[in-house]
Amino acid sequence: MSGAEEAGGGGPAAGPAGSVPAGVGVGAGAGAGVGVGAGPGAAAGPAAAAALGEAAGPGLPDEAGLAGARQLQEAAGDPDAPPKKRLRAAEAAEAAAAAAAAGSGKLEERLYSVLCCTVCLDLPKASVYQCTNGHLMCAGCFIHLLADARLKEEQATCPNCRCEISKSLCCRNLAVEKAVSELPSECGFCLCQFPRSILERHQKEECQDRVTQCKYKRIGCPWHGPFHELTVHEAACAHPTKTGNELMEILDEMDQSHRKEMQLYNSIFSLLSFEKIGYTEVQFRPYRTDDFITRLYYETPRFTVLNQTWVLKARVNDSERNPNLSCKRTLSFQLLLKSKVTAPLECSFLLLKGPYDDVKISPVIYHFVFTNESNETDYVPLPIVDSVECNKLLAAKNINLRLFLFQIQK
């Protein structure tokens, strides 16, 4: 709680001018501070007065500001006070002003806890829903609550007040959505603060530190760097001066990469023609192992796809001992079949980003034959673009992805 809140919205009003010691003037009105006039210690007055005025903000000074003012008045009003005492008093007054300013906290920090989702405790990225009592849920958590209730054959309830929730009982809260879109968020490239509503455009089009590519990448230039260095690089790029034979070798490599990409998408289109296809949104939740040195892992609640019950697990850097000491971060996952099957179940599966997240995942198709004896796949890499995207996932309260399952029938 801030000093202003502890004082009940502000300290008492300043008394008559005659009650103030000689050489000290108390300013009235907004941002009232304490200024030192003539007499010893006057040099310390303006800085402390400005600091105290900022700490107090609009209205009257709070308790911390008044305490600093009293210390400054005592030292300034006593002509016999030693210079060291006057200096210490001035420093104490400025420290009290700084503490009062820090105690109040930024508005956006206080709003964060007010507007966050009651389930994942994170700020919503898309739609915001509320129960009949006004508790907020982001779209991803709202859908998960409904899906979990369907699997348990129960009525979905608000995790706060336990009132019933459904798509017909809950409504969107546009005011909260707009308020969240105006809250400041930090650009991952330049570390500046921008409203969340324009942050994506800033990172893609305006940020001078955003990662960009050379315009000669089509003829093989591999350069990646900040946008403000692009002009200098392109002026010195050697690829435009290469001979035709050199460029043909580069273009052959690019054609091979293009063929692999086309092969992947053709495989996905082929899977989409299968008779039995299932997909669902999955939510990886963080847990800790029971080891002496605990390790982070993720696991989803049980879900049903293709009339079978499944679970997904994930781990960081293949459960290495100290992943926090590594600059490279990776996630790997495995799919577990929890149902009993009467015959081998051959499936292809892949993970993609969920509908309410912006993580960058490249599609990779995995294949496995599930039986009662072999009911879990090996850990396979989650195809995240880079360590930056992995850190974004690890920083979130939960990881929301979409799983596709294709049953191969012989």
Swiss-Prot record:
Tell me which CDD domains the record gives. CYHR1_C, RING-HC_CYHR1
Q: Which GO terms describe its molecular function?
A: zinc ion binding
Which top-level group of life is the source organism from?
Eukaryota
Q: Which parts of the sequence are TRAF-type zinc fingers?
A: 158-231
Q: Which UniProt keywords apply?
A: Cytoplasm, Metal-binding, Zinc, Zinc-finger
Example GO CC term: the record gives: perinuclear region of cytoplasm
The yes or no answer to whether the keyword Membrane is present is no
Q: Where are the zinc fingers (RING-type)?
A: 117-162
Compartments annotated for it: namely: Cytoplasm; Cytoplasm, Perinuclear region
Region named Disordered: 1-22
Compositionally biased residues, Gly residues: 1-13
Residues forming coiled coils: none
Q: Does the keyword DNA damage apply?
A: no
PANTHER family assigned? CYSTEINE AND HISTIDINE-RICH PROTEIN 1, ZINC FINGER TRAF-TYPE-CONTAINING PROTEIN 1
The entry assigns this protein to a family as follows: Belongs to the ZFTRAF1 family.
Self-association state and partner proteins as the record states: Interacts with LGALS3.
Name by which UniProt lists this protein = Zinc finger TRAF-type-containing protein 1
Q: Which organism is it from?
A: Bos taurus
